[in-house]
């Protein structure tokens, strides 16, 4: 039986929600600074925690998409992202918030890599330029939407350090539910065997030439 949930738009939606979650906290730092008495060094630590999580995810978890398929990794990334954002709303000091940002960084790497692969594989026309353009636009839209939503929620609602995260949490649950409803063609599923040590070893490789060319436009 064919699923009514078309995979391609929901993969795009999931990437947008994931990227939105990474940028949501940007307009909240002045409020954190007033509430917690943050120093510039504290903000640096929070940014470093996020970047360390994102880089670690890209270096050590990038192969998981090849092993388990993009859909499984995208689901895991969104669950982790939603968990990190929910925890951010409950954070009470700099160390707890930095841990949340680290988790969000790891989830960001999983989401962007798996969703990019998914949009390429689900593109029926095999148009790499279209897939690359869609990926770029989705990422840009998510990065722009996050601060706008977070800023508006913080401006007009009480308890801004909690309520600002609600849209991202709700959209995250919607994306997770949708990804568990979609069905992808068997040819796009690459889940074979279990996890090995080699799957989490850093690997640097050059993208396929057409993909590289289109991303450099």
Across the structure, where does each feature detected by a protein language model lie?
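Flexible cytoplasmic inter-helical loops of multi-pass small-molecule transporters
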Residues: 183-203
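Central cavity-lining transmembrane alpha-helices of secondary-active solute carriers
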Residues: 45-63, 112, 116
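Cytoplasmic helix-loop-helix junction between adjacent transmembrane helices
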Residues: 100-139
């Amino acid at each position: 039986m064919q699923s009514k949930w078309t995979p391609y738009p929901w993969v795009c939606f999931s990437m947008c929600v994931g990227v939105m979650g990474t940028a949501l906290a940007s307009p909240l730092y002045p409020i954190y600074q007033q509430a917690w008495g943050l120093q510039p060094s504290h903000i640096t630590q929070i940014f470093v925690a996020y970047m360390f999580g994102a880089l670690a995810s890209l270096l050590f978890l990038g192969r998981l998409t090849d092993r388990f398929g993009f859909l499984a990794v995208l689901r895991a990334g969104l669950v982790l992202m939603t968990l990190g954002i929910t925890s951010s709303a409950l954070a009470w000091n700099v160390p707890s918030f930095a841990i949340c940002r680290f988790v969000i960084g790891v989830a960001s790497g999983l989401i962007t890599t798996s969703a990019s692969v998914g949009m390429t594989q689900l593109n029926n026309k095999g148009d790499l330029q279209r897939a690359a353009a869609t990926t770029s636009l989705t990422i840009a839209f998510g990065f722009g939407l996050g601060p706008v939503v977070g800023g508006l929620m913080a401006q007009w609602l009480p308890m801004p350090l909690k309520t600002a995260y609600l849209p991202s949490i709700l959209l995250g649950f919607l994306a997770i539910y949708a990804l568990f409803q979609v069905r992808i063609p068997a040819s796009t599923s690459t889940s074979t065997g279990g996890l090995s040590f080699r799957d989490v070893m850093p690997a640097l490789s050059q993208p396929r030439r057409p993909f590289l060319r289109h991303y450099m436009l």
